């Protein structure tokens, strides 16, 4: 099967064949494509960008685009069109990316560089207030006393969109697994809006476009509340979402009851997909029509998982493309 055949509206011409990596539909969903980079491609990239530590990417933001260019050149110019077309394609919009040979925590800096290169072939990653950088690294362990579900291992992190409590355009989310030990469970959970059984009913409800207040706990280091609706549309009138159950603050009974019903519908959807992500692999999804979450872990005293996220905007003038925000 040619994974390209699902993309209806191209924003750039697609290559006849990928070079330096392969593409295939994932086992979990035909909407989620798997990109696997050959070891030779990965090794060549690591060597080519060795002169720049991650700190250089933090200080000089243009270098993030330069290392993206290097990765695309190693793939003979075939990578950027695939990433852009996929992230903007409503029928897909999601990728599980695996760079062969980057699979140990000792290679964490190279993992950050590789993910940064991919992200900056489609756009730019936003400032993350939690870390003070364009990315955030954090650890999940067996016990947790933080102020959100992000690091709590023994419960499901419900489906949500990122960027709900900041005034930043958040078109994409990238989630990398850097390390894990003594892990059982904890798969990524994904739901595409067009697969959600009750999407139309909630999208048509009067509450869908009501402006609501969104706040963040202290750990997010965001002081100001933001106001926006749960639903919006793209230019073709299709639903997009900006939603997270933890940070929305209903003003009254009616809003609270509707939000609770929305949450129960999302969590009860039979169309959720559970995706295992290996160390060094990462998900790159369109944040406006994919929701993501995390399944619970099996308790273990030595449990440890280190993750990195980037989230940002797509920087490409696709005709009729609207961010829905």
Swiss-Prot record:
Q: Which UniProt keywords are listed? A: Dioxygenase, Iron, Metal-binding, Oxidoreductase
InterPro entries associated with the record: GlaH, TauD-like_sf
The secretion signal range is none
- Under Enzyme Commission nomenclature, its number is 1.14.11.64
Q: GO molecular function: any one?
A: oxidoreductase activity, acting on paired donors, with incorporation or reduction of molecular oxygen, with 2-oxoglutarate as one donor, and the other dehydrogenated
For this protein, what does the record note about how its cofactor is bound?
Binds 1 Fe(2+) ion per subunit.
Which principal EC class is assigned to this enzyme?
A: oxidoreductase
What this protein catalyses is: glutarate + 2-oxoglutarate + O2 = (S)-2-hydroxyglutarate + succinate + CO2
Top-level lineage group:
Bacteria
* Its job: Acts as an alpha-ketoglutarate-dependent dioxygenase catalyzing hydroxylation of glutarate (GA) to L-2-hydroxyglutarate (L2HG). Functions in a L-lysine degradation pathway that proceeds via cadaverine, glutarate and L-2-hydroxyglutarate.
UniProt similarity note: Belongs to the glutarate hydroxylase family.
Q: What is this protein called?
A: Glutarate 2-hydroxylase
Q: Which gene encodes it?
A: glaH
């Amino acid at each position: 099967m040619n994974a390209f055949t699902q993309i209806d509206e191209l924003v750039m011409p697609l290559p006849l064949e990928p070079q330096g990596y392969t593409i295939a539909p994932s086992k979990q969903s035909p909407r989620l494509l798997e990109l696997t980079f050959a070891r030779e491609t990965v090794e060549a990239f690591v060597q080519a960008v060795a002169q720049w530590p991650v700190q250089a990417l933090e200080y000089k933001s243009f270098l993030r685009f330069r290392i993206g260019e290097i990765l695309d050149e190693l793939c003979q110019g075939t990578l950027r069109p695939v990433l852009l077309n996929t992230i903007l394609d409503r029928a897909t919009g999601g990728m599980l990316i695996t760079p062969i040979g980057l699979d140990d925590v000792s290679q964490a800096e190279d993992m950050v560089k590789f993910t940064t290169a991919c992200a900056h072939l489609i756009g730019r990653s936003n400032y993350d207030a939690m870390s003070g950088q364009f990315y955030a690294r954090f650890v999940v362990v067996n016990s947790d006393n933080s102020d959100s579900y992000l690091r709590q291992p023994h419960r499901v992190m419900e489906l949500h969109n990122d960027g709900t409590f900041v005034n930043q355009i958040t078109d994409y989310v990238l989630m990398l697994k850097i390390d894990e030990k003594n892990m059982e469970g904890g798969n990524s959970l994904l739901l595409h809006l067009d697969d959600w059984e009750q999407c139309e009913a909630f999208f048509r409800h009067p509450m869908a476009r009501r402006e609501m207040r969104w706040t963040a706990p202290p750990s997010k280091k965001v002081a100001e509340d933001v106001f926006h609706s749960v639903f919006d549309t793209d230019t073709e009138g299709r639903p997009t979402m900006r939603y997270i159950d933890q940070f929305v603050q209903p003003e009254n009974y009616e809003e609270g009851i509707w939000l609770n019903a929305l949450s129960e519908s999302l969590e009860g959807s039979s169309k959720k997909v559970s995706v295992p992500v290996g160390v060094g692999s990462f998900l790159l999804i369109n944040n406006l029509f994919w929701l993501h979450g995390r399944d619970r872990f099996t308790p273990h005293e030595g449990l440890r998982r280190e993750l990195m996220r980037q989230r940002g905007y797509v920087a490409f003038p696709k005709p009729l493309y609207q961010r829905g925000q």
